[in-house]
């Protein structure tokens, strides 16, 4: 199954978030209203947060009550949850 235009949009947002800061991961989510949120992983010596967790936190803190899609991009073959 090919991703639709809205799914391609969040994949592009996830790639852009990752590239912007040269992060290991980039993620984007779409909420029930169609709003999108993108984030890159944080990997500091004192703090590590996955890109997907950050994108979800951004959506929830902006008032999203449900998510309809998520995209995670990385060079890795596996991703830690």
PLM regions with names:
Residues 1-20, 62-81:
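C-terminal binding/interaction regions
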Residues 6-9, 26, 47, 51:
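Residues at the start of alpha-helices and the adjacent loop-to-helix junctions
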Residues 21-25:
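Short, small/polar residue-rich loop motifs at catalytic or cofactor-binding pockets
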Residues 26-35:
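Short beta-strand scaffold segments in enzyme catalytic cores
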Residues 44-58:
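A short, polar/charged loop-to-alpha-helix boundary motif
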């Amino acid at each position: 199954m090919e991703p639709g235009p809205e799914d391609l949009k969040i994949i592009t947002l996830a790639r852009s978030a990752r590239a912007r800061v040269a992060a290991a991961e980039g993620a984007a989510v779409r909420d029930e209203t169609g709003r999108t949120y993108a984030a890159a992983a944080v990997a500091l010596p004192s703090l590590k947060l996955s890109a997907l967790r950050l994108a979800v936190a951004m959506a929830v803190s902006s008032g999203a009550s449900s998510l309809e899609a998520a995209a995670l991009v990385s060079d890795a073959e596996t991703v830690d949850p």
